[in-house]
Amino acid sequence: MADYQHQQQHQRPADAFKGMFPEKGQAQVQGPSASKVIAVVTLLPLGGFLLLLAGLTFAGTLIGLALSTPLFVLCSPVLVPAAIVIGLAVTGFLTSGAFGITGISSLSWILKYLRGTSVPEQMEHAKRRAQDTAGHLGQKARETGQTVTGKGQEAGKTLEGGRGEEKKT
């Protein structure tokens, strides 16, 4: 019994790839789709180029480090404490910002929880406010249009009245 369980736990390495290739009795599977081929053809050279750039950057970094190491060793009594102070200051600022963002988001969540509003309710409220505002703006536009029309008619009557007097003279 123990031998049977022990044999079941072992897998042959070839078993992991069985699902990738069709067996002799199975129907032949179509090749990759056109979009997959285009993705590979496009991304393979791009990935190779980026890998080349990464290698060049790494080599340049190593060369620069090899050339500047003697200067760092000579100036280390000054540079090491300065680097530690700058590193601690940057860490402090980043930590402060992270704690601030965490605190604000926590307070915001607590406020929403205490109000008992959920996102769908907030969306519905915003939708209603937008509709009310649109209706209010439409009403104002109608009123303004009527006012402009009335003033235009008044101006037209005034001009007609003035022209009539000029013709008489």
Swiss-Prot record:
Biased composition (Basic and acidic residues): 122-131, 160-169
One term under GO cellular component: membrane
Subcellular location: Lipid droplet; Membrane
Purpose of the protein: May have a structural role to stabilize the lipid body during desiccation of the seed by preventing coalescence of the oil. Probably interacts with both lipid and phospholipid moieties of lipid bodies. May also provide recognition signals for specific lipase anchorage in lipolysis during seedling growth.
Segments carrying motif Proline-knot: 70-81
InterPro entries assigned to the protein according to its UniProt record, in alphabetical order: Oleosin (IPR000136)
Keyword DNA-binding: no
Name of the featured protein: Oleosin Cor a 15
Family the entry assigns: Belongs to the oleosin family.
Organ and tissue specificity: Expressed in seeds (at protein level).
Domain notes: The proline-knot motif may be involved in the targeting to oil bodies.
Primary localisation category: other
UniProt entry keywords in alphabetical sequence: Allergen, Lipid droplet, Membrane, Transmembrane, Transmembrane helix
Region listing for Disordered, in residue ranges: 122-169
One annotated GO biological process: seed oilbody biogenesis
Membrane topology qualifier: Multi-pass membrane protein
Statement: the UniProt record of this protein carries the keyword Signal: no
Transmembrane segments: 38-58, 70-90
